[in-house]
Structure formats: structure tokens, C-alpha cells
Amino acid sequence: MKRLARSLYLQVLLAVVLGALVGHLFPATGASLKPLGDGFIKLVKMLIAPIVFATVVTGIAKMGDLRKVGRVGLKGLLYFEVLTTVALAIGLVVARLARPGAGMNVDPATLDTKAIASYTNGAQAHGTVDFLMNVIPRDVADAFARGDILQVLLFSVLFGAALAALKDKGRPVLEFVDGLSLVLFRIVGFVMRLAPVGAFGAMAFTVGKYGIATLLSLGKLIACFYATSALFVVLMLGLVLRWCGLSLFRFLRYIKEEIFVVLGTSSSESALPLMMRKMEKLGCSKPVVGLVVPMGYSFNLDGTSIYLTLATLFIAQATNTHVTLVQELEILAVLLLTSKGAAAVTGGGFITLAATLSAVGNIPVAGLALLLGVDRFMSEARAITNLIGNGVASVAVSRWEGELDQARARAVLAGTVPDEVEPANDPEPPAMAAGLGLHG
């Protein structure tokens, strides 16, 4: 009992199991608990914009080398493009080999499209040009109010660059942002105490609303997706970590709390503040973490990429829509663009899938109705894969920059160096410790 009281990941795991039981045994009660999960995610999202701002500004201002900022950003984008392309291709290959939709013989005309209208309408408003233009905020207050990560990141980079250019004149502002960072991570510690409550409510709602029977009806698709996501993590991300001189399984154990929080909430964004904190304590470069992790939540969604190609071909197979190899390559090309607009929030992948089907044209958009019931059950694997992928990205780019403290990282993963994982008991958050050179 003492270990349960001190261990966040055990509390969240227990909450997920209890939530699933409540949703299964008392569906109406489970469905009514949705506000618990939504409230927790809103509390976390409330902190994301200011944390990204404080981390990026202090990292860039203390680094002082603006060319390095651009270099880190370009390396991050190149890494994202390679890994997400591989993820898209893997989903395509698995869909071709496993054929999870074969034999369903669904007539698109018989599908009820009313339930997916909100997704298809939303997809039409999220084209590639709109997405790129949306990186530039109308005003700073609006970007922070809406929690738009890319807009906040752009402003933070400019603010940090200006602060670095001011040198000693900007020191009072830098000290203020350092102090702000300390306060924000203390608040994160308070909020994460509510993670079990949020996970319980979110899981109870998912099972109560959609039911276990929905899972069984499309079991082959769900099994394919979970197996493919696991394969990607073990093979691709494991290979990247091996290049960095680290063990994948020790890395997964290190971020187990974040994984269970994401499992319960179905949103990788819910663990963003803790993930940034963990990566800095692992020994990753502070400027790299500040740039790569927030960017990754729009450009490095590995789990979502696997889902998009797998689900697209599933719909084609289920509706007996013939797709040639050339058309599959066209789908891959379209997804290379549309997948970058998938927000790391619950339902973002489904909206992007609707946009992709609309752009491709030959696969019926009505087929989305087949996925509506099970999409929520697949969102856990999407979100967890996205989370792990962004953590590995910060390690890889730090290694690429020659700024990964490998000795510390190995020691932290081996458990021989305390990682101070309890947020509420951490006297000095990573934004301060990293900037002052206190990584050990």
C-alpha cells in the first residue's frame, strides 16, 4: 500500500483497470464520467503553452548561438520526416499483407454518415496551406489562449533570440522567465496528482460509451494496429536508441508514468510537460528538448502515421474498392502532407484521415463510419507511440548535435542516478537545472 501511495504509474494503472470495469458493468455511469478525463486534460493543456515558452526562451537565451537554434530545428524536421515516412510505409505494408478489411463486403451507400459529419466538415477546414499559415499567430495572446503549440513555439524562438541578442541588458527578463519556469513545474506536480482521477474517468467513458462488443467486431484491425505500433517501437525506435548507446526497454521503464497517463487519457499531449522534464533529466540538451518535443507534437506523430495508412487501406478493402500500387503511393504522398496537420489530441488522427480520404477521392469517405466505434480504442496505441517517438527524437537530435550526456543517460536508465521523478518533491525543475548546468 505504501508503494501504491508513492507510485504515480501504479495509481494510474489501477485507475485504468477500475475505469474499464465501471464502464463495462455500469455503461451509463461510465459514460457520465467523461468530465473527469476532460477536466484533467484541460488542466494539463492550461500549462503547456507557458511551459513551452519558458523552456524554449531560457534554452535559446542561455545558448546564445542563433545559428545553432536553426541547425537544431532543421535536424529535428529532417528526423521527423524520415521517421514518419517509415511509419506511413510500415502501415501501408502491414495493411497489404494482413488485409484486415478483406471479406467485409460493405456497401458505402448503406453506411450512416451523420455521425462522421463533424469530422469531415472539420477536415475540409484543415488544408496544407491553412496549416502552414496557421503557424503565424494573429496575435500572441490568442496563441497562448488557444494553446497552439506551433504558434507559441514560433513566438518563443523569436523572444529567446531577441533576449540572447540583448545579452546583459536582457538578464532581468531571463531571470524572471527562469523563476516562472520553477513555478510552472511546481504546478505540474500538483496537477499530476490528479492523473489517476482523469485516467479513471476517461477509461470509464470509453468503455461505457462504446462497449467491449465494439472492440470484438473489428478485432483484426485493432490487433494489426497494436502489433504494428509495437513493432515500430521495438525495431525502429529501438534502433535509434541503440545508435544513441541506450536501451529501449530501460528507456520505456524510465517513462512508464507518462505512458500510463497517456494510456488513461488517450492523448499524448497530456504528458508533454512531464516528458520535457524527463528528457532534460535524462541528459538531453535543454535547447534540443525545448525545440524538438513541442515540434514533434505536430510533425512527429509516428503512431498516427501508422494508423492513417492502415485505416485508409482497411476502408478500401472493407468497401471492395480496388487500389493499385500507384494509388497507394499517391496515398502515401498525400499523407506525408496531411499527417503533419494531425494534432496530438484525442480525435486528431480521425480528422486527418477524413481529410486524406477527401483528397485521394477514390476511397469512399463514408467508410469512416466503420471506424467511428473503434477509433477511440486505437487512440491509446496512437498516443503512446507518439509519446515514445517524441522522447526518442529528443535523444536522437541531442546525440546528433553531440550534446547528449550518454554517461548520465545510461546511469539514469540503470537507476544508479536519481531522476527525481516526483514533480511535487522536486525543488528545482529542469528548465532551471539545465540552464545552470546542474545535470551532473
Curated annotation (Swiss-Prot):
Pfam families: SDF (PF00375). GO terms for biological process: L-aspartate transmembrane transport. It comes from the Bacteria. The chain crosses the membrane at residues 8-28, 40-60, 74-94, 147-167, 187-207, 221-241, 288-308, 354-374. Keywords: Cell inner membrane, Cell membrane, Membrane, Symport, Transmembrane, Transmembrane helix, Transport. One of its GO terms (cellular component) is plasma membrane. PROSITE patterns: NA_DICARBOXYL_SYMP_1, NA_DICARBOXYL_SYMP_2. InterPro entries: C4_dicarb_transport, Na-dicarboxylate_symporter, Na-dicarboxylate_symporter_CS, Na:dicarbo_symporter_sf. PANTHER family: AEROBIC C4-DICARBOXYLATE TRANSPORT PROTEIN, PROTON/GLUTAMATE-ASPARTATE SYMPORTER. HAMAP family: C4_dicarb_transport. Responsible for the transport of dicarboxylates such as succinate, fumarate, and malate from the periplasm across the membrane. This is C4-dicarboxylate transport protein. It comes from Anaeromyxobacter dehalogenans (strain 2CP-C).
